[in-house]
Amino acid sequence: AKGEIVRTHIMRPTWHYVAGKDLRWMLQLTSSRLKKVIDSWVKASGLDISENQYTQCNDLIGKMLSGGNCLTREEIEMELGHAGVPVTGDRVRRYVLRAEMEGIVCSGADKNGKPGYALLDEQVAPASSLPREEALARLAVNYFRSHSPATLKDFVWWSGLTVTEAQQAIGSIKELLVEEHFEGQAFWVFAACRKTENRDLIQLLPPFDEYLVSY
């Protein structure tokens, strides 16, 4: 309820839990790329959603959620339908995804077991924007500090960045990383977390464990 942790689509088109204070600068890094992914989905599904429709929906969603309101996607669909907006097929999901990409909405309180949406600016405290280079560096620090050892490919998959962007991010924090090679691959280890002593206990996590996959 305080917006300290929010659920949204931010690095890849899947749910992520994000610290509210980090949400805006992360959106600055990823939203344009994510919008292209969503647009390709729309085209592949045969839907025709224009930029004007997205703008109209963003405005309507902003109005219906203003004042601390929280609505489920089904409730948003009903309101959009009443306003004369096409809601057939998978359109409403795309409208809401775009509103997330634009930084208009994020998760609000769940309602009857279904995810609710609230206005980002009402749910999350204001935060300063970051220069792109600083945002890339911060994302890399957050990743390698919690996921080391990891490869460039790992970072690209997790972050949704391009290879060039990921390389730039790693390069900007190289003084914080140690490069190790194993079976022909370069792994980056966050130096402050590096341990050289042997461990008697090894803990394994399953694929797609939320701690590793989500942020």
Positions of predicted regions on the chain:
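Long, low-complexity intrinsically disordered regions
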Residues: A1-Y215
